[in-house]
Amino acid sequence: MAAVVLGGDTMGPERIFPNQTEDLGPHQGPTEGTGDWSSEEPEEEQEETGAGPAGYSYQPLNQDPEQEEVELAPVGEGEDGAADIQDRIQALGLHLPDPPLESEDEDEEGAAALSSHSSIPMDPEHVELVKRTMAGVSLPAPGVPAWAREISDAQWEDVVQKALQARQASPAWK
């Protein structure tokens, strides 16, 4: 780095960022009230007050693994451990309803649909409510592509059925 000579003084990184032992001249030192930086004030002032500029403070986390408060459940408890986990999930309000029982007389298409999608059990009243709600939904004209306006619902259902059958007939790429 080249030094620039101004008035006999050299200007380099050591003059821009002086160390604490260097004596600053009256023209180079910080003036009163010019900023937050001062080489004489330690940064521990905020720690003494307990709060930073926005009222937040730094609290170091415990680094000692021996003093952890959380007890980890031993692995291999079997059924008792699973029940304990279920109790914790219910206590936290994260309980999900039990999955529907699988019946052996389901057709393959229904089983494939249930296994490929997450299923929400709905009673017939809820199904009708969803149908009525969706019937009232209308998309704006720019949101519907031209091909969708030109095909009837019956034709579209036929296209979807053929696509589903073709997907089931082809080998799965897993």
From Swiss-Prot:
A cellular-component GO term for this protein: cytoplasm
UniProt keywords, alphabetically: Developmental protein, Differentiation, Phosphoprotein, Spermatogenesis
Ranges in coiled-coil conformation: none
Superkingdom of source: Eukaryota
Modified residues (Phosphoserine): S103
Region entry Disordered, spans: 1-83, 95-123
Tissue specificity remark: Highly expressed in testis. Transcripts can be found in primary and secondary spermatocytes, and spermatids, but the protein itself is only detected in spermatids. No expression in Leydig cells, spermatogonia, or sperm. Very weak expression in the heart, kidney, spleen, thymus and ovary.
GO biological process: cell differentiation; spermatogenesis
Pfam families for the chain: MEA1 (PF06910)
Xref: PANTHER family: MALE-ENHANCED ANTIGEN-1
Function: May play an important role in spermatogenesis and/or testis development.
Protein name per the record: Male-enhanced antigen 1
Species of origin: Mus musculus (Mouse)
Taxonomic lineage from the root: Eukaryota, Metazoa, Chordata, Craniata, Vertebrata
